[in-house]
Structure formats: C-alpha cells, structure tokens
C-alpha cells in the first residue's frame, strides 16, 4: 500500500444536519494533510459501485491522527447513502489527500480576509479558517444555506478568534433571507484575499464581483472518476487559454480566480 492509500477506521459518524453526515476517520494519512481544501477519494464497500467518492476534508487533528469529513447523502442507490451506514470500527479504503489546497503561508496578521461558502462547499473552509486564525488576521466569513435545517459548522466558525460570521438562508429560516450574494453587498472593506467554495452560481457571482482581486482563490466542486488527473472527467476551461483543460482533481480543486472561465 502506498502512502497515499489506506484503510482508515471510522471513529464516529452522525447526522450533522438534514441529510448531511459528519464522519471522523483515523489513520496515518492524516500525517500527509497540510493544505486546507484538499480532498479524500473514498471507495464504497458495495461492489456494484466502482467509482470512488471525492469528499473534501473539513478538519484534522494530527496528534489524534483523525480527520473529519461532511457530506450530503443521496437516495438509497447512491454511494454516499452507503457511506452513511458505516459504524465506528468500520474500515474505509481511502486515497488522499489529493489535489491542490488553499494557500495560507502568505497571509499576515495585517490582512483582511474574506471567506465565502455555500451549502456543502462550506466544510473545507473550516480547516482553512483554523489555519488562518494562527496568523492573527481578521476574517469575515459569509455562509449561505438553503434553510436552517441544513446549516452546518456555525458553532465551529464562531469559536475561532478574530472572526465576524454572517449567515444567509434562501428561505429566511435563519439569518439573512436570501442567497449569500446578499451578504456580499454588506461588506464595507477591501479584502486582501478571498477564499470561496460552493455551487457554480455562487462562485460565478463571487468571481464577477471580485474579479480585480489578485488573491482570489476558488475551490471547484465537480464529479470525478479517477481523482488523479488521468480520465479528464472533471475539467474546467482555462480563462487564459480556452483550448487548455484544467483538471479539478489534479490542477485544483483550488484555483486562482484569474485561471477560471466561469
């Protein structure tokens, strides 16, 4: 077994919000986790499901050798539904961490950081915020969800230092009514860097509003097959060269905003 593949152990699993599960995994792969925004490629035990499931890493604890993932389940025919049935002690065949993550080394204590997340794109932003907290920078975090019953990680973000957290829900059941773009309109400062992950429509809106920001980092969500750049199933167009295919699994999932043609 290579260092990028391991049978990790399920430590715990719970339904964190409606149809969104939180799984804690333990294994030596955690030693390889350094950049927030990378993902794991999980094999589903059901033999009929050949493709692995890419799931972003929400956080990790290197001393405990554990990491946490959050994922939305589908119906009973889906691989994520199968994953949600795993109990503590179960083994999961995992490759990772894969892809390029969010750069944090350049952030300083004087930076004003804007983090924008939507739905199931929120989890990888939590480890990012944890690492940014260590720099002493000021963070404004905008999160959008469909409704209160699918809201995740609010307490975790709130417990970080130097954080201003705002939440919007489409139906107005929690926080500001409307999509996360409405929260963007409330920002009255110039961000030094922006990190975002969420649905394509949200990412497009962020990229349009902040297209002049040099340090704009966008994490793309995409269906994947191989997870290592061999199959070209998860491509995005290069903004500077439309004939060039950017592979989300290998070149991303995190890209500079100026790279993407959204």
From Swiss-Prot:
Keywords: 2Fe-2S, Electron transport, FAD, Flavoprotein, Iron, Iron-sulfur, Metal-binding, Pyrimidine biosynthesis, Transport. Binds 1 [2Fe-2S] cluster per subunit. The keyword Transmembrane does not apply. The keyword Oxidoreductase does not apply. Transmembrane segments: none annotated. SUPFAM superfamilies: Ferredoxin reductase-like, C-terminal NADP-linked domain (SSF52343), Riboflavin synthase domain-like (SSF63380). Pathway: Pyrimidine metabolism; UMP biosynthesis via de novo pathway; orotate from (S)-dihydroorotate (NAD(+) route): step 1/1. [2Fe-2S] cluster binds at residues 226, 231, 234, 249. Pfam families: DHODB_Fe-S_bind, NAD_binding_1. FAD binds at residues 53-56, 70-72, 79-80. Residues 3-104 form the FAD-binding FR-type domain. Responsible for channeling the electrons from the oxidation of dihydroorotate from the FMN redox center in the PyrD type B subunit to the ultimate electron acceptor NAD(+). HAMAP family: DHODB_Fe_S_bind. Belongs to the PyrK family. Heterotetramer of 2 PyrK and 2 PyrD type B subunits. This is Dihydroorotate dehydrogenase B (NAD(+)), electron transfer subunit. It comes from Lactococcus lactis subsp. cremoris (strain SK11).
């Amino acid at each position: 077994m290579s260092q990028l593949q391991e049978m990790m152990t399920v430590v715990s699993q719970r339904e964190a919000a409606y149809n969104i599960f939180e799984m804690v995994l333990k294994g030596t792969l955690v030693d390889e986790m350094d950049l927030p925004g990378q993902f794991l490629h999980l094999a589903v035990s059901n033999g009929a499901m050949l493709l692995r499931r890419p799931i972003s890493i929400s956080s990790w604890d290197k001393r405990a050798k554990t990491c946490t993932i959050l994922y939305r389940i589908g119906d009973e025919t889906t691989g994520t539904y199968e994953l949600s049935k795993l109990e503590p002690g179960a083994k999961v065949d995992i490759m990772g961490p894969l892809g390029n993550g969010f750069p944090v080394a350049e952030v300083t204590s004087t930076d004003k950081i804007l983090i924008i997340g939507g739905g199931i794109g929120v989890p990888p932003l939590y480890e990012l915020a944890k690492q940014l907290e260590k720099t002493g920078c000021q963070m404004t975090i905008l999160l959008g969800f469909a409704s209160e019953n699918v809201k995740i990680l609010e307490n975790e973000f709130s417990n970080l230092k130097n954080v201003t957290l705002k939440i919007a829900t489409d139906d107005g059941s929690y926080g500001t009514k409307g999509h996360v773009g409405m929260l963007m309109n409330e920002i009255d400062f110039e961000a030094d860097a922006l990190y975002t992950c969420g649905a394509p429509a949200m990412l497009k809106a962020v990229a349009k509003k902040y297209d002049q920001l040099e340090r704009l980092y966008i994490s793309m969500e995409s269906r994947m097959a191989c997870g290592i750049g061999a199959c070209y199933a998860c491509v995005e167009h290069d903004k500077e060269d439309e004939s060039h295919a950017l592979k989300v699994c290998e070149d991303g999932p995190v890209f500079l905003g100026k790279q993407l043609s959204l």
